[in-house]
């Protein structure tokens, strides 16, 4: 061990290892200390880089010299092997014994000449320069960078690659790559004394896979592998100066048309914008409803029955425009995502309108929407009967006195939205018409119905439904302490009493939905319906007006005899209330933007529904009859009295002349059908027949 390092180096190494100098030669202990100090001195661990380098140098030198010292022939000899002193054999043995010491003991005895002693030639001559080693290139030539992929860490797969290596390795890799990847084409090019391999593979590979394969064959030679973005441009550049083609797998090489196949048909993509526009025009906020309606557009509009009937305006008005896009949409894999984005756009548009539009403008827009719907339903292609809806107007007008004024005042309350004067209360027993009128007002203004009879912990998300709504209805609120034992108790009134900030509208409240952030806004105004439950004074003060409903037997009988009002939900429709306002209110009460449309509808109602007809409807309601029995009664009364007009007399004479019996009193089985178009006093469904009966003179 004393011959491994000199004294100064051994002492320095032991100090660096942190061991006592007496431990010199204990190789296992020194090895453990070396590994421990490597972690301590390593620069990445915050150690001293200089100490690390010095310790590595001394330790490696010590290890190398220890290996030489432990060789079998190092200083090993036996007494029997020593020849006789003075012989030639002994001289040879002594020379071999001292061979390993000659290097350490050798010194130059010749003195170097000083500058003064040097000759003139030695002072002015330049020593021969050593031949510098040519450095390996670090990248492809700069003029090729535009055609190569510069991605270093990428999982992208390609089918064209370029390899830059030495001339000797280029010859080997040319054959190895051809065998390994069954290349479609490969060529070898010379470049500044090196080789560039350009090749195409039948399958796509990562650049790292090609590089790893080539690195196995290039242990010492440099290797650069990259993917090719512009195949033909790179190949054509490598075929011209300063490059040249050495060999290639296809005679004549590649041509430009080899990289320009026939252009396939462009894959048509679904237009998300068209679907969003459709959702905005129809104001659809339901993802699955939008998905179902748009899938119906994939059928040919010329063969579509819905388009031929023209009953659904949201279908026949948009079918032809969206047919081509719906055909592509039917094959899409992300239909729900597209519809979800369209619905989100509708909600975003609604939020913007809530922020920037006045409540009067929002109500006017709602009225325009209902008027558009009325134009289609009562138009030439519509299936709705105007008399049915006017019968609903007559029924609602009999529900409460001055119904038109009541609705007008409610709309003013909703539009102005004054704090602590924003809510109405509809109170009354069962089947008194509270919910019917509340549902009609909700459909007229637009909004949501909420259930506050839930437990308080579930009420948070129920209130979140009111986000960005124009109005709300707290429907059928339950309480406790009612006089009637038939009324069940509930948490509704207590919950409403806990929502005073919501009802007042003075401060903004936090509303939240599942999977959405909280929305801070003024809670929308509205009304509350309930049975005869007692109210605390704190809650009673939140209602600006209370309307007490009472059941009316004649209204119930008329409703039971007029089933079309229930089947078509005419009484709960906002169109019925709008027709009521058009019939009773002056044009000046409406917004100026829609007054011209109100005038048109007033003229139409005057031409189709006379005051006498409307009076007969109200008379039948008061009598508990079918509301549309006025036509049948007029026919029978005209036959009995004989005071009909000339047209009526002619039709009566015509019917009598066609009667084979010739008697004046027709049997009950031959009573004219009020729905027969040949009867001048028929009830016309739609606009198939334009024969309108003349209004009989007042009796």
From Swiss-Prot:
Chain positions with Phosphoserine modification: 114, 122, 125, 661
Domain annotation SF3 helicase: ranges: 402-562
Signal is among the record's keywords: no
Positions of post-translational N-acetylmethionine modification: 1
GO CC terms: host cell nucleus
Sites where the protein binds ATP: 428-435
Subcellular location: Host nucleus
UniProt short sequence motif LXCXE motif, positions renumbered to this chain: 105-109
Annotation: DNA-binding region: 141-256
T-ag D1-type zinc finger locations on the chain: 267-359
Residue numbers of N6-acetyllysine PTMs: 691
Cofactor note: DNA helicase activity requires Mg(2+).
Alphabetical list of SUPFAM superfamilies matching this protein: Chaperone J-domain (SSF46565), Origin of replication-binding domain, RBD-like (SSF55464), P-loop containing nucleoside triphosphate hydrolases (SSF52540)
Residue ranges of the region described as Disordered: 115-137, 637-678
EC number: 5.6.2.4
Known role: Isoform large T antigen is a key early protein essential for both driving viral replication and inducing cellular transformation. Plays a role in viral genome replication by driving entry of quiescent cells into the cell cycle and by autoregulating the synthesis of viral early mRNA. Displays highly oncogenic activities by corrupting the host cellular checkpoint mechanisms that guard cell division and the transcription, replication, and repair of DNA. Participates in the modulation of cellular gene expression preceeding viral DNA replication.
Protein name in the entry: Large T antigen
Organism: Simian virus 12 (strain wt100)
């Amino acid at each position: 061990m004393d011959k491994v390092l000199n004294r100064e180096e051994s002492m320095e190494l032991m100090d660096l290892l942190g061991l006592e100098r007496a431990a010199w030669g204990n190789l296992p202990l020194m090895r453990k200390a070396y590994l421990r100090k490597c972690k301590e001195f390593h620069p990445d661990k915050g150690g001293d880089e200089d100490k690390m380098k010095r310790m590595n140098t001394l330790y490696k030198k010590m290890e190398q010299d220890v290996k030489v010292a432990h060789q079998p022939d190092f200083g090993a000899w036996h007494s029997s092997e020593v020849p006789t002193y003075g012989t030639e054999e002994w001289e040879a043995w002594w020379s071999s014994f001292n061979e390993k010491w000659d290097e350490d003991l050798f010194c130059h005895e010749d003195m170097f000449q000083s500058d003064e002693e040097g000759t003139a030639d030695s002072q002015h001559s330049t020593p021969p320069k050593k031949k510098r080693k040519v450095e390996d290139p670090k990248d492809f030539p700069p003029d090729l960078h535009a055609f190569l992929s510069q991605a270093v860490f990428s999982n992208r797969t390609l089918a064209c690659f370029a390899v830059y290596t030495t001339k000797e390795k280029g010859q080997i890799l040319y054959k190895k790559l051809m065998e390994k990847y069954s290349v479609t084409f490969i060529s070898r090019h010379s470049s500044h004394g090196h080789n560039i391999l350009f090749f195409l593979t039948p399958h796509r590979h990562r650049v790292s896979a090609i590089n790893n394969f080539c690195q196995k064959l290039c242990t010492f030679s440099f290797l650069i592998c990259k993917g090719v973005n512009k195949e033909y441009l790179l190949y054509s550049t490598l075929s011209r100066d300063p490059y040249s083609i050495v060999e290639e797998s296809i005679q004549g090489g590649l041509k430009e048309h080899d990289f320009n196949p026939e252009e396939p048909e462009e894959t048509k993509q679904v237009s998300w914008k068209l679907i969003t526009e459709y959702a905005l025009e129809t104001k659809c906020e339901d993802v699955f409803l939008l998905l179902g309606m748009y899938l119906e557009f994939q059928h040919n509009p010329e063969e579509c029955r819905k388009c031929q009937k023209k009953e659904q305006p949201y279908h026949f008005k948009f079918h032809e425009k969206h047919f081509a896009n719906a055909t592509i949409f039917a094959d899409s894999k992300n239909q729900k995502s597209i519809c979800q984005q369209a619905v989100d756009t509708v909600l975003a548009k609604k939020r913007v309108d809530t922020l920037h539009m006045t409540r009067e403008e929002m109500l006017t827009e709602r009225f325009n929407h209902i008027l558009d719907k009325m134009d289609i339903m009562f138009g030439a292609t519509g299936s709705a009967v105007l008399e049915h809806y006017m019968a609903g107007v007559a029924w609602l007008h009999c529900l409460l006195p001055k119904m038109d004024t009541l609705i007008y005042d409610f709309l003013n309350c909703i539009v102005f939205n004054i704090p602590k004067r924003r809510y109405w209360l509809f109170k009354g027993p069962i089947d008194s018409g509270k919910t019917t009128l509340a549902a009609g007002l909700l459909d007229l203004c637009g909004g949501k119905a909420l259930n506050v009879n839930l437990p308080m912990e579930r009420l948070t998300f129920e209130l979140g439904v009111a986000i960005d709504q124009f109005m709300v209805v707290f429907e059928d609120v339950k309480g406790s302490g009612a006089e009637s034992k038939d009324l069940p108790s509930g948490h509704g009134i207590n919950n409403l009493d806990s929502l005073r900030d919501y009802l007042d509208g003075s401060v903004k409240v936090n509303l939240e939905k599942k999977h959405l952030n909280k929305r801070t806004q003024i809670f929308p105004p509205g009304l509350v319906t309930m049975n005869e439950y007692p109210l605390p004074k704190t809650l009673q003060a939140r209602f600006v007006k209370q309307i007490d409903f009472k059941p009316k037997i004649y209204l119930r009988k008329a409703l039971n005899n007029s089933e079309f009002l229930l089947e078509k939900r005419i009484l709960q429709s906002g169109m019925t209330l709008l027709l009521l306002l058009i019939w009773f209110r002056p044009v000046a009460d409406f917004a100026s933007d829609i007054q011209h449309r109100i005038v048109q509808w007033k003229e139409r109602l005057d031409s189709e529904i006379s005051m006498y007809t409307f009076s007969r409807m109200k008379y039948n309601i008061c009598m508990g009859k079918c509301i549309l029995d006025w036509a049948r009664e007029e026919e029978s009364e005209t036959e009995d009295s004989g005071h009909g007009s000339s047209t009526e007399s002619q039709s009566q004479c015509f019917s009598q002349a066609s009667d084979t019996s010739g008697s004046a009193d027709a049997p009950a089985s031959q009573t004219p059908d009020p729905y027969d178009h040949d009867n001048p006093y028929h009830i016309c469904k739609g606009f198939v027949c334009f024969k309108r009966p003349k209004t009989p003179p007042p009796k």
